[in-house]
Curated annotation (Swiss-Prot):
This is 4-hydroxy-3-methylbut-2-enyl diphosphate reductase. The gene is ispH. Homodimer. It comes from Salmonella typhi. It catalyses: isopentenyl diphosphate + 2 oxidized [2Fe-2S]-[ferredoxin] + H2O = (2E)-4-hydroxy-3-methylbut-2-enyl diphosphate + 2 reduced [2Fe-2S]-[ferredoxin] + 2 H(+); dimethylallyl diphosphate + 2 oxidized [2Fe-2S]-[ferredoxin] + H2O = (2E)-4-hydroxy-3-methylbut-2-enyl diphosphate + 2 reduced [2Fe-2S]-[ferredoxin] + 2 H(+). HAMAP family: IspH. (2E)-4-hydroxy-3-methylbut-2-enyl diphosphate binds at residues 41, 74, 124, 167, 225-227, 269.
Length: 316
């Protein structure tokens, strides 16, 4: 059985930054550090940080006065941000800069009185945070998930309308929704480049290349990870059997026993150690040496806040 690895896969710059913010805060200030929502959607990462003293909460009211609070990589609404400001808290923002860019687009539309449409998944924390940047009662902020949603949407003024997208969507599905928006609202204005982030796009391209050769595709990522789910869906759409797994223990031998080639990738919030564990598990089932496919090089780095720019090893 051949083992192929997608390239790129795993951590993106936004996830790296968010995890570093929590790790550095723990090193500098000590436990406990409070984090609103899971800092990234990966069980292994969250459990690891929890063991080191991070406390994950959903409501600002759960945080005691004087504590350190970190916003997750998914971002928060202005209401949450203002609630935190009203408290005696030291706040660090781990929102991915590419999510912040979308927040700024929404806030700009709100100030101008333009109505805005967000393409995204209802209930996802990034969507809640992005929708929460809009505050103009004269306008409107709407969420659509599919072309069908677009055709049933009514707005106040089609002449002052813009759209944005969640950063972790399927490139193909989003393109279909954007096409529907432009047909229904010919004057709608969108970003110069859609808001789906480079890491999401690159990992979807890598899965396409992987699925062209693999019989079975294993996507390492947690069930609540939007970008990981999109990778599994894309492989399935290409006619491959695909499984979303948290770690190597999830793999059933029956999934791969008849496969000549198994492809492995990881969502943007999944650490490489989980991929290495999957490779080891597949080798127990008769897999050969893992081969990494050629792919797009990523060298983007997002800096942590200056107050947290320390060498954790020196602090420890």
């Amino acid at each position: 059985m051949q083992i192929l690895l997608a390239n790129p896969r795993g951590f993106c710059a936004g996830v790296d930054r968010a995890i570093s913010i929590v790790e550095n805060a723990l090193a500098i200030y000590g436990a406990p550090i409070y984090v609103r929502h899971e800092v990234v959607h990966n069980r292994y990462v969250v459990d690891s940080l929890r063991q080191r003293g991070a406390i994950f909460i959903e409501q600002i009211s759960e945080v005691p006065d004087g504590a350190i609070l970190i916003f997750s990589a998914h971002g928060v609404s202005q209401a949450v941000r203002n609630e935190a400001k009203s408290r005696d808290l030291t706040v660090f923002d781990a929102t991915c800069p590419l999510v912040t860019k979308v927040h700024m687009e929404v806030a700009r539309a709100s100030r101008r009185g333009e109505e805005s449409i967000l393409i995204g998944h209802a209930g996802h924390p990034e969507v809640e945070g992005t929708m929460g940047q809009y505050s103009n009662p004269e306008g409107g902020m709407y969420l659509v998930e599919s072309p069908e949603d677009v055709w049933t949407l009514n707005v106040k003024n089609e002449g002052k309308l813009s759209f944005m997208t969640q950063t972790t969507l399927s490139v193909d599905d989003t393109s279909d929704v954007i096409d529907a928006l432009r047909k229904r609202f010919p004057k709608i204005v969108g970003p110069r480049k859609d808001d789906i982030c480079y890491a999401t796009t690159n990992r979807q391209e890598a899965v396409r290349a992987l699925a062209e050769q693999a019989d079975v595709v294993l996507v390492v990522g947690s069930k609540n990870s939007s970008n990981s789910n999109r990778l599994a869906e894309l492989a399935q759409r290409m006619g491959r059997t695909a499984f979303l797994i948290d770690d190597a223990a999830d793999i059933q031998e029956a999934w791969v026993k008849d496969a000549a080639c198994v492809g492995v990738t990881a969502g943007a919030s999944a650490p490489d150690i989980l991929v290495q564990n999957v490779i080891a598990r597949l080798r127990e089932f008769g897999g050969g040496e893992a081969v990494t496919l050629e792919g797009r090089e990523e060298n983007i780095v997002f800096e942590v806040p200056k107050e947290l720019r320390v060498d954790v090893r020196e602090v420890e």
